[in-house]
Design a protein with these regions (language model features):
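Acceptor/aglycone-binding surface of glycosyltransferases and processive sugar-polymer synthases
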Residues: 36-59, 76-157, 188-196, 202
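Residue-level signature of catalytic and energy-coupling elements of molecular machines
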Residues: 53, 71, 142, 171, ...
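Short beta-strand/loop segment that forms part of the nucleotide-sugar
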Residues: 1-2, 9-19, 39-40, 68
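Short beta-strand-to-loop acidic/aromatic patch adjacent to the donor-nucleotide binding site
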Residues: 62-73
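A conserved acidic beta->alpha catalytic loop
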Residues: 16-25, 72
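Residues at the starts of beta-strands that form the adenosine-phosphate
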Residues: 10-11, 64, 177
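Hydrophobic helical membrane-anchoring modules
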Residues: 2, 16, 128, 152-223
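Residues at the C-terminal ends
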Residues: 6-7, 59, 87, 173
Length: 223
């Protein structure tokens, strides 16, 4: 991002969930103009990591947040499209490699069809609108969305992948402005994803079903 000049477009915050590759050394971060390094020390996985980042951004007064994975697979040159979406009043912008202008490069076969046939259809049904690429963490959220009392993303129920699924659908359910942004997601040739075990896959399906059944909604009259 620093080499591409992206760091000049917005403040950059790194939310670390336990990196051990040396990329978060203080001197390295300073040389890249990173504003803050947040380190998750408590329980939970991705959702806990994201809650930490969202909370910091809201407390610091930011009006919008763009999130992107740190694995180098996403097209950082697409970040201005997310910033433009936020500036135009969009509340939730989701990256998609499958819409016009997007590109899916070397996506593993099983992952491609799991998104197309399971993940995206279920979350589209839950959202009440068509969404094409629902597993991506490359997204933008408005302050209005995350701070809405009908959303409440900082609850402890969000620990693993629940928050990504929930926030994917909740904006549409509330009638907020939602768009998909064309991006490129590139996997190295021949890469076989190993991040999610068989047990993890069952857990993911359970999360999708709970999202579909609105089990992550706040328990109040406003939900």
């Amino acid at each position: 991002m620093h080499a591409a000049g992206t760091m000049k477009l917005a403040d950059v915050i790194v939310a670390d969930g336990g990196s051990t590759d040396g990329s978060l050394e203080p001197e390295e971060l300073r040389s890249c103009d990173v504003r803050a390094l947040l380190v998750k020390t408590g329980p939970g996985k991705l959702s806990a990591q994201l809650r930490m980042a969202y909370a910091y951004a809201l407390e610091e007064g930011y009006e919008g947040i763009v999130t992107i994975d740190g694995n180098g697979k996403d097209s950082i040159e697409s970040i201005p499209l997310f910033l433009d979406a936020l500036d135009s009043g969009v509340d939730y912008a989701q990256a998609s490699r499958f819409i016009a202008g997007g590109r899916a490069i070397n996506t593993p076969f099983m992952r491609h069809w799991a998104i197309k046939l399971v993940h995206a259809p279920l979350l589209s049904f839950a959202a009440g609108r068509r969404l094409t690429d629902t597993t991506q963490g490359f997204r933008a959220y408005s302050r209005r969305y995350l701070a809405d009392p009908r959303v409440r993303p900082f609850r402890d129920v969000f620990r693993t992948y629940e928050l990504l699924a929930y926030l994917t659908v909740r904006a549409s359910q509330l009638g907020l402005r939602v768009v998909e942004v064309p991006t490129t997601r590139t996997y190295p040739p021949g890469e076989i994803p190993t991040k999610i075990s068989l047990r993890g896959q069952f857990s993911m399906v359970a999360i999708l079903l709970r999202t579909l059944l609105r089990q992550y909604h706040p328990r109040s009259k406003a939900s």
